[in-house]
């Protein structure tokens, strides 16, 4: 019945759009009067996919809220599913109204960072929380062909960075060091994204943002460099985290989830570059392409989000959480996933085996479960508390080394200033030695002795004494002439 209702709604919307377009009352975006006749079918087709991208995720979210048996997992999974309708709505609004394109793009970029954080927290929740995740990492080892058997079974694992990252970043030891590095690397992107979005809005209001203009008097290139480095580091941390836990999370098919999420993030960025390159090379021609040059990216995103909404139904299903209605609530759904359509593996079944006995729900168990309003409240407030704690943790761990670095720089400058003052003080207290005869005046006096030694001659004590007396007499005569 639910699927029939969704299909009927889609058919009704399509029929209304076709009838309105047929009678000429289909509204057109503000691209000019001449372009209106070409934009009826792009807007109509984009609207159909946007409706799909809204209805299917909403249906999936309601399914998760109705079977809200694993709050730690589902609260962030719902935030991840919301990525599709958010992208679809803002792209459609940007396609319709060019004046709202900038604000819509800022919202999309901010939610991208939030979705990246939600995906990481969802994987951690599937591993039964932070403590169990760190314990699992500490049990991992890196075993190669040259590693002795006994040594490999008791040594901790190490995450090695590829070139050129290994030239700047030390290897991470699996455990608290690796977990905190990944956590900070992902949360910092969410924080910087919000800060840069606020700065972009302020600069745009003053007309000095200059989106797409790489000029020193605009703020766009500086914010773009900061965000690109931040995003690259966050995605790198997520990939490293996935590589460590992918075998542990095999029952929930993490590869499909990871590729689905990553494709949405990367496609929206790379396709914009490809479209701009095609237009710059003149490979895309035609009046429709020229009219949609500035909005073709939004149109493509609308189409992609409709497809992604269908994919999410199979990648992030609510069926494993519905099975939790017949067992204790505080048990992870790892074996529920494994029992649906994954071939049973003895080790995985043993590893994901429940510590409590399954049972049918009684009346008291139903009362312990959250109802629909309580589930919504937990998604909003519960996830908000975790986000605030992670942001506070990240800021404290980032600000502390920055403060130490600034303090070290201040001490260095203070030491340099003290040395300069000490040198100036010594220079003032030193006596004036301008009356001293320069050394070049004495050069001729010692040249005779040097020539005598060089010619092989000897200098006796008496000869040296006479020479000294001769030099003293010459010096006294020279001093007398200088005083005159």
UniProtKB/Swiss-Prot annotation:
Family: Belongs to the TMEM184 family.
UniProt-annotated location(s): Membrane
InterPro entries from the UniProt entry: Ostalpha/TMEM184C
Membrane topology: Multi-pass membrane protein
Coiled coil: 406-428
TM ranges: 42-62, 76-96, 190-210, 219-239, 264-284, 299-319
Composition-biased stretches (Basic and acidic residues): 347-364
Organism of origin: Arabidopsis thaliana (Mouse-ear cress)
Superkingdom of origin: Eukaryota
Principal location class: membrane
Signal peptide: 1-19
Key words of the record: Coiled coil, Membrane, Signal, Transmembrane, Transmembrane helix
Name of the protein described by the UniProt record: Protein LAZ1 homolog 1
A single BP term in Gene Ontology: vacuole organization
One cellular-component annotation, GO: plant-type vacuole membrane
Chain residue ranges for the region called Disordered: 344-364, 459-484
Upper taxonomic lineage: Eukaryota, Viridiplantae, Streptophyta, Embryophyta, Tracheophyta
